[in-house]
From Swiss-Prot:
It comes from Baumannia cicadellinicola subsp. Homalodisca coagulata. The lineage of its organism: Bacteria, Pseudomonadati, Pseudomonadota, Gammaproteobacteria, Candidatus Palibaumannia. It holds the Pfam family Ribosomal_L34. It comes from the Bacteria. This is Large ribosomal subunit protein bL34. Belongs to the bacterial ribosomal protein bL34 family.
Length: 47
């Protein structure tokens, strides 16, 4: 059986990136939660 994690930056950014978060209501809620916690990195795309 192959391993499930096959890294790809493009897929990673498209799924978890900033623009992906902004695009949906729930994604914006994620960003709001992370801003409230004062996270230094809101999403994986702006490391």
């Amino acid at each position: 059986m192959k391993r499930t994690f096959q890294p790809s930056l493009l897929k990673r950014h498209r799924t978890h990136g900033f623009r992906a978060r902004i695009a949906t209501k729930s994604g914006r809620q994620v960003l709001a939660r992370r801003r409230a916690k004062k996270r230094s990195r809101l999403t994986i795309s702006n490391r």
